Amino acid sequence: MMLGLENKLKLYGFNNLTKTLSFNIYDVCYAKSEREQKDYIAYIDEQYNSERLTNILCDVTEMIGAHVLNISKQDYDPQGASVTILISEETLAVKEIDKSCNLGQIDILKTRDTIVGHLDKSHVTVHTYPEYHPDNSIATFRVDIDVSTCGEVSPVNALNYLIGSFDSDIITIDYRVRGFTRDIDGKKLFIDHKITSIQDYIDENTLKKYDAVDINVYQSNIFHTKMLIKEIELQNYLFNRDVYEIKPKQRLEIENNLRKEMIEIFSGTNIY
């Protein structure tokens, strides 16, 4: 489902609603030795460096119909990356844009050690969090993306693209609408589009791969969806190892440990 411009509400003045999408994905991997765990973290760090994350966020900006004003990005030592993009709902004349904004020009970005993106009213940010523990054979990787917009632009239109951009075993999505605008008669509007569930904006083929749970507070315009991958294809969770090198009994044990890790992350509770 897309939030289109058809059947537009007739508003008085500017649309003052703020729509914020918080999107977290978790990728889980089996890495038995400390060497494998460190290699996995290094691999993830390279796969999702600030340059690739910048490209993803620029695509998101285009999908929601916004325009890049400024980009800031940074890779961290020993691992992790961050990107922030400031966006505007409509194209602005060059003379209207603050001189500190780089408009996402790559040649400018190459001359800076740190890059941040800005919108006139809105922003898009991403941070990565690789993680492992030497006493645990499982390593994880979290991507935290926030898209906040004002006006007619809604970030939920980019959900399918975001899910497809990462290897997602667990997904948590929060969407909220704040503020109010007015119609032409002066009546307050606390939301300007219909929504009953975040799942309404996720492709059916994607939903079939996950168990999904909603927790919504409609009177507060708060929507929350959690998703857990249904099937574990073990080969996809092994780092630099072939599944056939592992004995069947150990395969089952690894699958059980992966599933337990996913369930705890999904529930936000130490269960096992």
Swiss-Prot record:
Residues modified to Pyruvic acid (Ser): 122
Record's keyword terms, sorted: Autocatalytic cleavage, Decarboxylase, Lyase, Polyamine biosynthesis, Pyruvate, S-adenosyl-L-methionine, Schiff base, Spermidine biosynthesis, Zymogen
GO molecular function: adenosylmethionine decarboxylase activity
A Pfam cross-reference name: AdoMet_dc
Family to which this protein belongs: Belongs to the prokaryotic AdoMetDC family. Type 2 subfamily.
Cofactor(s), by name: pyruvate
This protein's GO CC annotations: cytosol
Gene Ontology annotations of biological process type: spermidine biosynthetic process
Reaction(s) catalysed by this chain's protein: S-adenosyl-L-methionine + H(+) = S-adenosyl 3-(methylsulfanyl)propylamine + CO2
InterPro entries registered for this protein in UniProt: AdoMetDC_fam_prok (IPR003826), S-AdoMet_deCO2ase_bac (IPR009165), S-AdoMet_deCO2ase_core (IPR016067)
Annotated site residue numbers, Cleavage (non-hydrolytic): 121-122
Cofactor, free-text remark: Binds 1 pyruvoyl group covalently per subunit.
Name of the protein in question: S-adenosylmethionine decarboxylase proenzyme
Pathway: Amine and polyamine biosynthesis; S-adenosylmethioninamine biosynthesis; S-adenosylmethioninamine from S-adenosyl-L-methionine: step 1/1
Active site residues according to the UniProt entry: 122, 127, 150
PTM note: Is synthesized initially as an inactive proenzyme. Formation of the active enzyme involves a self-maturation process in which the active site pyruvoyl group is generated from an internal serine residue via an autocatalytic post-translational modification. Two non-identical subunits are generated from the proenzyme in this reaction, and the pyruvate is formed at the N-terminus of the alpha chain, which is derived from the carboxyl end of the proenzyme.
Gene (UniProt): speD
EC number(s) on file: 4.1.1.50
Binding partners and assembly: Heterooctamer of four alpha and four beta chains arranged as a tetramer of alpha/beta heterodimers.
Cytoplasm listed as a keyword: no
Function description: Catalyzes the decarboxylation of S-adenosylmethionine to S-adenosylmethioninamine (dcAdoMet), the propylamine donor required for the synthesis of the polyamines spermine and spermidine from the diamine putrescine.
Natural source organism: Clostridium botulinum (strain Alaska E43 / Type E3)
